[in-house]
């Protein structure tokens, strides 16, 4: 069996139990065997991975190593990778090969990590089930008839199925945390601006944030150590200094106060999911943490506000895909208008078109004040709610999703039902706060996820809370059988 965690791989490489090439070959063989069913990867970079693994082994033998040297990872296909196709799960970019490397993937290359490939995703990161991909849906490895979550479903399913040690994702309204919950993983959405967006194809620029998928909070801390930091090439990148996110993992929880937002424990929450959360609360209490009920009164407005702001930003960001400069171009256009119309009609899927139309409507002259400006005012109220609550407590504990993974096709005919899947993840995104998703139980053989939300730039505290919980539970150690 492959080692499950980055920490185990680091130890194995250091102790010469295996080489980076050997472990990379094992992962590539597993991808060949399981990816045809799960559809986690859009592109597998076998030659690149083996070359990087050999270089990592050479560095290791020369004593020139770094923390992630030789560790095989996968990247969501929204990060530009020089010389490697970056599709964003869309026909529009099916053949797009970026001429440069994103900051995130560049940092992992510089850290010595091995790139196994690019993972499947909802088209342009728009979706909550990974059913919107031009390259077909991803299947949840816990039950292949169910969704892995979205939009980073390929990354989540790949890590859960053991096709890679960890993976990158992006989170606009829950696209790391929701798949982490559905697939039984640890997933971190950092504070907005903590991770560079350079080379991360934009969906909603004021919300998009890159982050890691891993099996443990400790692994997520190791990954964030590489990903985080100011990037002068990204105008939204935070100037706040980074830290060693592993340094506080062992800190005891005595004296920590955790808030329970009463609006999240509502009748929308499945009873068995709530029971799992109550058991998690007991674990934290046994570790010395105390709990306090808090209120986030504008929570119910988060989904409608988000589905004005995010589509508005997407409608402007995706205007660049016009068939002229790059991306899909229709055949034999009769004039410029025909080129624009047919290239975009052919290149974009239904959900992307829906959101472009919603966003264009919200930004139109007659409706800008009624919709977009109002949504931004609500966003400020939601942020103020969090600021007030987090002045009283060290972090918030709440569900990630209302229920466990739903069946493929179950919600595709009703966009509103699909949008409501993000009801517990969107608020932290609108506020720009860091949030950590963790597995905390099972319901009917499917993972249940919980979410820890912290104040700005308190990722180390969230990872400490996650690590201490995982030292005292084993939910994160469970893996889907996959016929093994």
Curated annotation (Swiss-Prot):
GO terms for cellular component: glutamyl-tRNA(Gln) amidotransferase complex. SUPFAM superfamilies: Amidase signature (AS) enzymes (SSF75304). The keyword Ligase applies. It catalyses: L-glutamyl-tRNA(Gln) + L-glutamine + ATP + H2O = L-glutaminyl-tRNA(Gln) + L-glutamate + ADP + phosphate + H(+). Keywords: ATP-binding, Ligase, Nucleotide-binding, Protein biosynthesis. HAMAP family: GatA. Belongs to the amidase family. GatA subfamily. This is Glutamyl-tRNA(Gln) amidotransferase subunit A. It comes from Hahella chejuensis (strain KCTC 2396). The gene is gatA.
């Amino acid at each position: 069996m492959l080692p499950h965690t980055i920490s185990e791989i680091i130890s194995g490489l250091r102790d010469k139990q295996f080489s980076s090439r050997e472990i990379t070959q094992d992962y590539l063989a597993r991808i060949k065997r399981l990816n045809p069913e799960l559809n986690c990867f859009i592109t597998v970079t076998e030659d690149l991975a083996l070359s990087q693994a050999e270089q990592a082994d050479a560095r290791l033998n020369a004593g020139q190593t770094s923390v992630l040297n030789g560790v095989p990872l996968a990247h969501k296909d929204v990060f530009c990778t020089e010389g490697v196709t970056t599709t964003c799960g869309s026909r529009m970019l099916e053949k797009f090969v970026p001429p440069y490397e994103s900051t995130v993937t560049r940092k992992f290359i510089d850290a010595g990590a091995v790139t196994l490939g690019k993972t499947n995703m909802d088209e342009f990161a728009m979706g909550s089930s990974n059913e919107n991909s031009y390259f077909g849906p991803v299947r949840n490895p816990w039950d292949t008839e169910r969704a892995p979550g979205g939009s980073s479903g390929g990354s989540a399913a790949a890590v859960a199925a053991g096709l890679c040690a960890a993976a990158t994702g992006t989170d606009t309204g829950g696209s790391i945390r929701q798949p982490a919950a559905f697939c039984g993983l640890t997933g971190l959405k950092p504070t907005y601006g903590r991770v560079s967006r350079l080379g991360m194809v934009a969906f909603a620029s004021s919300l998009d944030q890159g982050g890691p998928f891993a099996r443990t909070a400790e692994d997520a801390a190791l990954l964030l150590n590489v990903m985080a930091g100011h990037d002068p090439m990204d105008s939204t990148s935070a100037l706040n200094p980074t830290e060693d996110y592993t340094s506080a993992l062992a800190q005891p929880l005595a004296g920590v106060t955790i808030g329970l937002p009463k609006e999240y424990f509502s009748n929308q929450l499945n009873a068995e999911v709530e029971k799992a959360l109550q058991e998690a609360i007991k674990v934290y209490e046994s570790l010395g943490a105390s709990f306090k009920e808090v209120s986030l009164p504008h929570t119910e407005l988060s989904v409608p506000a988000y589905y004005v702001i995010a589509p508005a930003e997407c409608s402007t960001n995706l205007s660049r895909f016009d068939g002229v400069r790059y991306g899909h171009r229709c055949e034999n256009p009769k004039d410029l208008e025909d080129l624009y119309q047919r290239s975009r009609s052919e290149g974009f899927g239904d959900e992307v078109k829906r959101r472009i139309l919603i966003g264009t409507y919200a930004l139109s002259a007659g409706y800008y004040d009624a919709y977009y400006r109002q949504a931004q005012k609500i966003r400020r109220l939601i942020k103020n709610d969090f600021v007030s609550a987090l002045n009283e407590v060290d972090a918030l504990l709440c569900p990630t999703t209302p229920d466990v993974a739903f069946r493929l096709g179950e919600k595709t005919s009703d966009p509103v039902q699909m949008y409501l899947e993000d009801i517990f993840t969107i608020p932290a995104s609108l506020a720009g706060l860091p949030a950590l998703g963790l597995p905390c139980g099972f319901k009917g053989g499917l993972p249940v996820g919980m979410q820890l939300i912290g104040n700005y730039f308190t990722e180390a505290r969230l990872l400490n809370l996650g690590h201490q919980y995982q030292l005292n539970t084993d939910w994160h150690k469970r893996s889907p059988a996959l016929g093994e």
